[in-house]
Amino acid sequence: MFYHNKSIFHPVTFFLIGIPGLEDFHMWISGPFCSVYLVALLGNATILLVIKVEQTLREPMFYFLAILSTIDLALSTTSVPRMLGIFWFDAHEINYGACVAQMFLIHAFTGMEAEVLLAMAFDRYVAVCAPLHYATILTSQVLVGISMCIVIRPVLLTLPMVYLIYRLPFCQAHIIAHSYCEHMGIAKLSCGNIRINGIYGLFVVSFFVLNLVLIGISYVYILRAVFRLPSHDAQLKALSTCGAHVGVICVFYIPSVFSFLTHRFGHQIPGYIHILVANLYLIIPPSLNPIIYGVRTKQIRERVLYVFTKK
């Protein structure tokens, strides 16, 4: 069914296939996805609870970690429950407006995650390269400003995607070979010119690349400062403060780069591999981030044990 809007036809609903080629295995696939989603919910909720309860965890690093956990909860919840609805209840149809809203939220929260990782890199840079000025540089006003940038820039970058989708005519095609709605997945169903959609998508990706470059530059300075320290123990201690952040960066960027490369150049790779990678990209980082910080950050590890064992 279609409705007419200023000479542009939009479908009332889209049909999300799920994982094309693996429809018969949806029920089996749902188990691991549900388990990982529950780990993401429990892990990030625990991080937020510990940071809220423990007054000693008030450093900027934990402030950014709380933001990261909030974004991870939002990102995974935006995509996984809808996906499980497809796997468990054959709830394939999604309203046109709901599909565009899901697209906006997924892209916006993904952008926010990239922004908060950049902010955390700046925090580690100041902590290692200018430790005596840490408190004077990362003041509460600066933290508020960084927090606003974390939210505002991805939202501003994602909003044009909504317009670029609404301007497109959709003649008869309404089947999306995916388990969630994303920008180019919707655009490719259009019978209009989607060149501007592709160009803008690459423009947005360039900001992810820029963030990664800036993170890399910050770690060049961090490593230079670390290797100038007089003792081996001091070097290890300084590097250990960055270990969790490096792990989270790898968890976020490696799947995203792999997903991008397989989508752009892996034309011989089966379609279900593309979709599985895209799904893992949205659920693996939110589930692993709290585990990485719980294992690698002494304060978090000790406080988690304290909060859940104290009487």
Swiss-Prot record:
InterPro entries: GPCR_Rhodpsn, GPCR_Rhodpsn_7TM, Olfact_rcpt, OR51/52/56-like
Transmembrane region(s): 28-48, 57-77, 102-122, 142-162, 199-218, 239-259, 275-295
GO molecular function ontology, one term from the record: G protein-coupled receptor activity
Signal sequence range: none
Family annotation (SUPFAM superfamilies): Family A G protein-coupled receptor-like
Any Pfam family: 7tm_4
UniProt keyword terms in alphabetical order: Cell membrane, Disulfide bond, G-protein coupled receptor, Glycoprotein, Membrane, Olfaction, Receptor, Sensory transduction, Transducer, Transmembrane, Transmembrane helix
PROSITE patterns, per the entry: G_PROTEIN_RECEP_F1_1 (PS00237), G_PROTEIN_RECEP_F1_2 (PS50262)
Membrane topology (UniProt): Multi-pass membrane protein
Side Extracellular, residues: 1-27, 78-101, 163-198, 260-274
Localization annotation: Cell membrane
Keyword Zinc part of the UniProt annotation: no
Disulfide bonds: C99-C191
Cytoplasmic side: 49-56, 123-141, 219-238, 296-311
Recorded GO CC terms: plasma membrane
Carbohydrate attachment residues: N5
Family: Belongs to the G-protein coupled receptor 1 family.
Physiological role: Odorant receptor.
Protein name as it appears in the record: Olfactory receptor 52J3
Gene source species: Homo sapiens
Lineage per the UniProt record: Eukaryota, Metazoa, Chordata, Craniata, Vertebrata
